[in-house]
Design a protein with these regions (language model features):
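Glycine-centered hinge/linker elements that transmit conformational signals in sensory
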Residues: 193-196, 239-270
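A structural signal for short loop-to-beta-strand junctions that line the ligand-binding cleft
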Residues: 96-97, 104-105, 133-173, 207, ...
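Hinge/lid segment of periplasmic solute-binding proteins
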Residues: 33, 111-165, 220-224, 310-312, ...
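Extracytoplasmic/periplasmic solute-binding protein
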Residues: 150-159, 164, 174, 188-243
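Short, solvent-exposed loop/beta-turn-alpha elements that line the ligand-binding surface or hinge
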Residues: 40, 127-140, 183-185, 207-209, ...
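Extracytoplasmic "Venus flytrap"/periplasmic binding protein-like
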Residues: 68, 72-140, 175-177, 182-185, ...
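Extracytoplasmic/periplasmic substrate-recognition and gating elements
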Residues: 44, 176, 260-267, 301-371, ...
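C-terminal capping/gating helix-and-loop segments adjacent to ligand/active sites or protein-protein/ligand interfaces
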Residues: 393-448
Length: 461
């Protein structure tokens, strides 16, 4: 069958790219939406195996939602959540489960796994469930829905979404003679502030700036500048991505800026581990950092009694934010498996999905985790209003996303080789921060990525 050959080809190309095997002999089929009465026709309790990557407090919040759903469906549906490790580990296990015919009914996959999941031909699009039920997907925040919509179809349901912000230490700004209510808007302004903040110039903190070597952060500089990170309209309109614009003028300028900041003692190279950059900011060693909205609560708690925390829209490379431009979302979404699963299992997974995104569930999820509420009506819930009153900085994220127009430049690049693209971007930045020429480093990364993209595209025809 064509589907089997495609999946086997995906296995080969992902192995060549250094990823785990994807799939084997599972027949492609059973991808249709079940009948509405599928659960009524089922005998006994229908179980939904649910693989996810939420740990610590986020995992506790997710399990609480699962328990609430199960309590409301005793004798009919039982969701069985299983933590499968971080995103990369989870998708590796998913690929192995396809090969062994043991896929979960529902899978949480990170944003950059979107095109792979579509190409795997293993999932039933959420759009199809919604159309069957006349379910209004318009309740999903437009930019978040936009990320998971490819060729006009929403394939998965966002669960945990976030956008990046510029966080800064207002107390340090005041000590350095800077206006704490006028945060930097672009890279030049960050440098100007860092020059006054950094110890090397007699400033109040060790370093003015510090952020993790994280590809998602670099991708945002294309989005906020109104530029495509990948060609083919970021892979959004049907034509496959054949090139990532890693060595574009904006990317080179960004990496050159970052390198010089480190060389001049205005920024610290904290490496790829995001926690290291977070800890440096919490400890007051750095005065500015780039991070997701998921850190609003953590940064606020760390700053309490130590310094006043500020947050601002994600910076642009130069000038001011282009009209309609803004950040693209990150996080993960939910996918419902088709092959190997009964009609009742698919329907039960859909019912659970709807429960997770209803306003009260999303208000709970938002207030417990700091992730962006994907259902816009969640912001009207009393619990969410109380949370925003206590965490007013989150309004910065809401405003930033609200004014960002949905389009190819702001929904992020969707490509089957996106995990490799992101890692390669990190490789380029990392090499530059230890002394390599930024333009040459990114040019080499561009060549390496082109091979990965071509191999993937060849595998799917």
């Amino acid at each position: 069958m064509i589907g089997v050959r495609r999946v086997l080809a995906l296995v080969l190309v992902l192995l060549l790219a250094g990823l785990a095997a994807c799939s084997g002999g599972r027949p492609i089929g059973n991808l249709n939406v079940p009948a509405k009465d599928a659960l009524d026709a089922a005998n006994g309790v229908t179980e939904v195996s649910f693989w996810h990557s939420m740990d610590a407090s986020n995992g506790i919040a997710l399990v609480k939602l699962v328990d609430d759903f199960n309590a409301a469906h005793v004798g009919k549906i039982k969701v069985l959540p299983v933590y499968q490790g971080v995103y990369d580990d989870a998708i590796t296990k998913y690929k192995a489960s396809v090969q062994s015919n043991t896929t979960p009914t529902m899978m949480q996959i990170y944003d950059i796994g979107t095109q792979f999941m579509i190409d795997s031909e293993q999932v039933v699009p959420m759009d199809d469930f919604a159309k069957r039920d006349s379910f209004d997907l318009g309740v999903i925040q437009k930019n978040i829905a936009g990320y998971y919509t490819v060729q006009g179809k929403q394939w998965s349901m966002p669960l945990n979404s976030s956008v990046p912000l510029l966080y800064y230490n207002k107390t340090a700004f005041k000590a350095a003679g800077l206006d704490p209510d006028r945060p930097p808007r672009n890279l030049a302004e960050i440098r100007t502030a860092a020059e006054k903040l950094s110890k090397v110039n007699g400033g109040p903190v060790t370093y003015g700036f510090g952020a993790a070597i994280y590809g998602w952060l670099l991708e945002q500089f294309a989005s906020t500048s109104g530029e495509l990170f990948c060609n083919a309209e970021n892979g959004r309109t049907g034509e496959r991505v054949t090139q990532a614009n890693i060595n574009s003028a904006k990317m080179v300028e960004t990496v050159q800026w970052w390198q010089k900041m480190v060389d001049d003692g205005l920024a610290v190279n904290t490496g790829r581990v995001t926690k290291d950059a977070q800890d440096a900011f919490k400890a007051g060693e750095t005065a500015m950092t780039l991070e997701s909205t998921g850190q609003v609560k953590g940064f606020s708690s760390a700053a309490e009694g130590k310094f006043e925390l500020g947050a601002a829209a994600y910076p642009v490379v130069s000038g001011t934010e282009a009209t309609g431009a803004g950040p693209s979302v990150g996080g993960a979404s939910l996918w419902i498996s088709g092959p190997g699963h009964t009609e009742a299992e698919k329907e039960a997974a859909w019912q659970f999905t709807k429960f997770l995104i209803q306003p009260d569930s999303q208000a709970f999820w938002h207030t417990q985790t700091g992730y962006f509420p994907v259902n816009t009506k969640a912001l009207d819930e009393p619990a969410d209003k109380e949370y925003l009153a206590k965490n007013p900085l989150f309004q910065v994220a809401i405003d930033s996303l609200s004014r960002t127009e949905v389009g190819s430049t702001t929904t992020g690049c969707v490509a089957g080789s996106m995990p490799q693209i992101r890692k390669a971007t990190e490789d380029g930045l990392e090499r530059a921060l230890i002394g390599k020429d930024p333009a040459q480093s990114l040019a080499q990364v561009q060549k390496n990525v082109a091979v990965s993209i071509a191999n993937y595209n060849d595998s799917v025809g």
